[in-house]
Amino acid sequence: MRSWCTFGCKGIWLLLVLCWNIQGHELKVTLLGTGSPIPLIERFGPSSLVEAGPEKLLIDCGRGATVRLWQRHVPLGAVTGVFLTHLHSDHVVGIPDLWLTGWLPPPFGHRAGAFQIWGPIGTKELMANLKKAFATDIRFRMADGIPREGAAVLAQDLTQGPVFERNGVKVTAFEVDHATAKPAFGYRIDYGGHSVVFSGDTRLNENLIHFSKGADVLIHEVAWARPELLKKSEAARIIIGLHTTPEEAGTVFTRVNPRLAVYSHVVLVTTDPAFTEPTSADVLKLTRKTYDGPLEMGEDLMTIRIGDKIDVRR
C-alpha cells in the first residue's frame, strides 16, 4: 500500500508540475482599451496587457489603462515594460498615471524599480518632458519618504528588430504605415512556442504581414465609416486614410492565417450626427467579404489565453 501511495503521490505531483509548466508557458493577453480618441465608457483608449512568465508588458497606454489594470487586480507597479506603437496622444495619455500612480506605496502601486518604456523616436523626449512636468509632484512624494528609485525612468527609442529578450520573452518591433506618424511600429511577442502580434495603427501593410507569419493570434486595428458619410466629410476621409478598412484587414488575416484574428482599436467614424453610426456588427460583416477564419471583435477586459488551445473570455 505504501509503495502504491508513494507512486501515486509522485505521479499526481508530476502531473501537477506538468500542468503548471504548460500553463506557465501560455501567453495571456488582456485588451484593456479597444477604443479610439472618442471618450466612450465602454471602449477606453488603446492599451493591451501581455502576461508571459514573470513579465507583464503593456502595448500602448491610452486613456484609462490604469483603471482597467486594477479591474483585473493587476497592481500598476507590477507592469514590467511599456511598448508604444507611436506617439499619437490617444496611445500615450495614460503614461503619467501608470508611471506615477504605480510608484505610490499602496497595493495598487508599489513599483520599486525604474519605469521601463520603449517606443519610436521621440519616446525618450516624451518621458524627459513628463519628468519636468511632474517634478513638483515627485519632489513632494520623495519628501513624504517614497523611495526615488520607483520614479526613475528608463526610456529607449527603438528601430525595427528584436528590442526585448528577458525571461524567455522576446519582443520584436516592425515598422507599419500610419501615414504621417513616422515611424510607427507593430509588435510581435514570442514566448514558450506561442506568439501574438499587435498591428499598431496602420494602413494595409506588407511588412506587418511578413512579421505576422506563423503567429497564433493577430490583433489588428480597424476603421470604418458609412460610404454616404465619406462622400460628404473630408474629416472622415482623412481618418479612414490613416487606418485599415474591414475588407483590407480581412485580406491581411487571410494572408497571415493566424489561429485567431482579433479586432482592437476599433475606429467607428462619426463626424456628422446626421448619419447613422456604424457598428461593430457592420465591421464583422464587411470583414467576411475577404476572410472566413476565426475572428473576434475585441472588447475592453477581454482575455485571450494562447497555448495549445486558444481560450477567449469576456
Task: List PLM regions with ranges.
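Cap/insert and terminal regions of metallo-dependent hydrolase folds
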Residues: 185-186, 195, 203-302
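Binuclear metal-dependent hydrolase catalytic cores
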Residues: 2, 22-196, 282-311
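N-terminal secretory signal peptides that target proteins for export/translocation
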Residues: 1-7
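Bacterial N-terminal signal peptides
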Residues: 8-21
